[in-house]
Amino acid sequence: MANKPGERKLQILQTVAQMLEQPKGEKITTAALAARLELSEAALYRHFASKAQMFEGLIEFIEQTVFGLINKITQEEKSGLQQTEAIVSMLLGFAQKNRGMTRVLTGDALVNEDERLQRRINQMLDRIEATLKQSLRMAATQGEVNATAEVGAHANLLVCYVTGRWQQFAKSGFTRDPLAQWPAQSAILLGK
């Protein structure tokens, strides 16, 4: 059982993530969550003021993980094109390893929840797009991609690709692996 401060909070977030991994994609209710944890709903509200706060905790985990990995990629990889490929691959792999989080990233789990949650996901996707744009700009100066190509449009296309693969994965009940065709598709998307 969770004894230390913060341990119960983490247990609640992990349980929400596990519930989101169910292929049927049922709505998460505090009653169902409390039952799964063998707690009262009141006990849940001692740790989180609202269900929206629980989703904010999951989004915070996603942001910390994704941007931590992006920072590592951009620091270690000197090629702009390799940065771009590694970031897209990481985003697809993150979904593959964190199925429940994929439903948060696609907004599927946020339907009928506080709209600020979807805004936060949108802001995260905008930050990812800006990072891809920087990597593509670097690739253009390094002669790895066409220097006259519109890097903003290219970065947007890559984000659309990633979110589309996330959607396919979530909507298929997690059977369509987001990385399944990535090697062939990366050659098309990155002009390799």
Show which residues each predicted segment covers.
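Hydrophobic/aromatic-rich alpha-helical bundle segments in the mid-to-C-terminal region
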Residues: 106, 118, 122, 140-187
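Amphipathic alpha-helical packing segments from all-alpha helical-bundle domains
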Residues: 64-67, 71, 115-142, 152-156
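Hydrophobic/aromatic residues within well-ordered alpha-helical segments
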Residues: 8, 51, 58, 62-66, ...
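Hydrophobic alpha-helical connector segments
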Residues: 57, 71-97, 151-158
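Short hydrophobic/aromatic patch on the recognition helix
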Residues: 38-48
